[in-house]
């Protein structure tokens, strides 16, 4: 999978052309998501071009993911246990690129402003053929899935909400007290 999600910075047509050329140079098979780019990219024998595809469905069916490094896409790739290459555009994306490398689930990032087809082609081969990335990504994905993060987060939110509602029941509400108070006496005639 190669996709840059909601990224519209710079020339997305150029970015997608670089990705397409890298797939052709490397010989890997890929799904290229055009995302919000609104760009037409010609398919090839080893390249399927798609608009938006649900990551939680697709990432289970690919061998690796290449993306912009948004928190959501990074988490989806890790949860699926897939080696990851980040092409950060800006914002928090360099942070996630650093984490991917530190966790051993992918190679050094290629910042968007340094992205070339030959550089990406080499990274695609490295990403898909280096066993240590596959092993580390699979192990991390298994650990993450065992955490049941959504279930735990929902329980914490519900617990805190119940606690907050109980505190609200005990605390006086100045607005309600004001609404139930006796109206003030009318003012007398001016002196």
Go through each PLM region and give its residues:
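Donor-nucleotide binding loops and adjacent catalytic segments primarily
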Residues: 1-64, 178-180, 191
């Amino acid at each position: 999978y190669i996709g840059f999600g909601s990224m519209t910075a710079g020339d997305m047509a150029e970015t997608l052309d670089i990705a397409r050329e890298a797939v052709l140079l490397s010989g890997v098979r890929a799904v290229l998501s055009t995302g919000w780019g609104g760009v037409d990219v010609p398919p090839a024998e080893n390249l399927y071009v798609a608009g938006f595809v649900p990551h939680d469905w697709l990432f289970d069916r690919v061998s690796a993911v290449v993306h912009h490094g948004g928190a959501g896409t990074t988490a989806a790739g890790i949860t699926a246990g897939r080696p990851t290459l980040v092409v950060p555009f800006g914002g928090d994306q360099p942070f996630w690129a650093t984490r991917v490398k530190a966790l051993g689930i992918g190679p050094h990032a290629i910042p968007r402003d340094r992205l070339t087809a030959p550089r990406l082609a080499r990274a695609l081969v490295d990403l898909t053929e280096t066993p240590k990335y596959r092993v580390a990504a699979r192990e991390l994905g298994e650990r993450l899935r065992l955490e049941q993060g959504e279930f735990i987060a929902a329980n914490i939110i519900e617990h805190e909400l119940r606690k907050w509602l109980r505190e609200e029941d005990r605390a006086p509400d100045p607005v309600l007290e004001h609404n139930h108070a006796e109206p003030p006496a009318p003012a007398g005639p001016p002196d």
